[in-house]
Amino acid sequence: MTKDKLTDAMHLRRREVLGGLAATGLATAAGFGPAKAQSTRTGVVRVWGEPGPYGGVAVAAMNEWAQKNAPGLKFEIESIPWDGVYVKLMTDLAARRPPSLISVESPIAMQLMAEGLLTPVDDLVEKIGRNRLVDGVKWEYWGAWKGQQFIIPAHHQPHLLLVRMDIAKELGLSDPDAWDWNDLLNAAKTISQKKPDMAGFCMALGRNLCTDYHFAALLHSAGGRMFDAANRFEVAFDSPQTVEALTFVKELQPFMPKGAVEYSFLQVVDAHVTGRTAMSFYWGRTLGRAAEEAKPIFEATEAFNHARHPTTKRRNNWNDFQGWCIPAQNNPFIDEVRQALVYQQTNKDWLIKYCHSLMPNVAPTYRDIADAPELQNHPFYKSKPRTVDTYFKTSLAHSSSTANEMLQGVNPLAGIVHGRSVLAQTVQKVVIDNMKPQDAAKWGAKELSDIRRENIRLLG
């Protein structure tokens, strides 16, 4: 979001804000109840967020709170890639200068929570509204540990199957929403054969997070897991389900771009937006970029829940339940951050601006926002209503992630797994080294066992 747009956004009429809050019964929680004494604190409140305009929108809302309640404070966003958060936080804690608020993806949030580095936020849940969550989710999906909530929802963001429907119709392919893995494989093969200048399908295969996330969805759809949450996170990776998921990736590889073994987030988006693939796994950013750079591709692309596994019928995505967490140590602004966060989380106008800042990538987490008529005041609701609904709502029934595999239990080891690229390396053993999937599964299981043994303290 540009500086001008943020400035304009900060000049909301107070009557509009109050009207929106009154409609959801949240005026008191947002700080419009009995007057409170202003904070006399001064300084800069450091807020970490991953690259993206939505962090800036949230901070603009917090600065609106500060203007009224803590005029000596200024909230400032610092963009930090999520996989750099843990190392930088350890460095900043050692220097006694941590950020005061962090928006981060769920795997690292779960690790910080289990490490005891965060402030509990159970009382904020009550102020924000415990019963506001959209259907199909629970507060603990964002982060609860040993009976306490540590993470406040920012958004959820699933990766889905993106399909060029113009190509699908031209080649007589069936409805992608009805596909299973065999149908997806056949569609990728058909496109590659009949469109020699275009890959049939694209996912990341490089040694990076994107590959981790893409493969995890296939692993979970097959019924496989890294760890068994019900058995104190014993390693469960050396399984027929892991072998099946790895085999499927190997079968898809001939119909992917030749450089896919190096691909990460950017390259997958590039391949789709530039017309070098007809299908891809990705989050909503692809559509946002296509709308700006490649209108015909944007108009032709629709998002679908993932192809079903032929046996389990599961169609899991990797859904990041991204949230806000408050570092507990050497944080001089805990009280002010808590108040500002409640203000942002209970202000309908700001929450809608947050979602609109990167459509349809950051999905609303509260029912009153998801159902608000104002949310539909965005061009994508006219041009891509079914796709937006899939990202925002129907994907939730198929949510999974490495931080909460099959939603069976928060995993404090996931961030460490991603830090070592265990899943991506396992995939590369198959697609680059031509290792048998069975042997690759055993290799990955050993790596996961090492992680569990070295970090057993996190399991309590």
What annotation goes with each model-predicted range?
Residues 1-12, 23-25:
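N-terminal secretory signal peptides
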